[in-house]
């Protein structure tokens, strides 16, 4: 069953475009990992600085298995654009 890893992120003032670009690039990188079922990116319709990034995985174990390789990704641009740490949690799909 697919598991989602959902992150809520806020861009620094004036960095929303940079965060969007970094998350688009991250979605492509995530899709290439074994066990990944892709990623989705949403922007809050009422707050251009607030994003939701959803990684879809075959299982929590599949996500945890790639953590060492994930840490090798160039995360500088994403981290520079963030206004604080992302809020992330695993979710199980109930209806799709």
Predicted segment positions?
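Short, flexible segments with low predicted structural confidence
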Residues: 1-3, 18, 34-36
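An amphipathic, aromatic/His-enriched active-site/gating alpha helix that lines ligand/cofactor pockets
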Residues: 25-37, 56-89
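Short alpha-helical
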Residues: 14, 25, 48, 61, ...
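Short, well-ordered beta-strand segments in beta-rich or mixed alpha/beta enzyme
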Residues: 3-10, 40-67
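Glycine-rich beta-strand-turn "strand-cap" elements at beta-sheet edges
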Residues: 1-3, 40-49, 76-96
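Short, surface-exposed ligand-recognition loops at beta-strand->loop->(often short) alpha-helix junctions
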Residues: 10-21
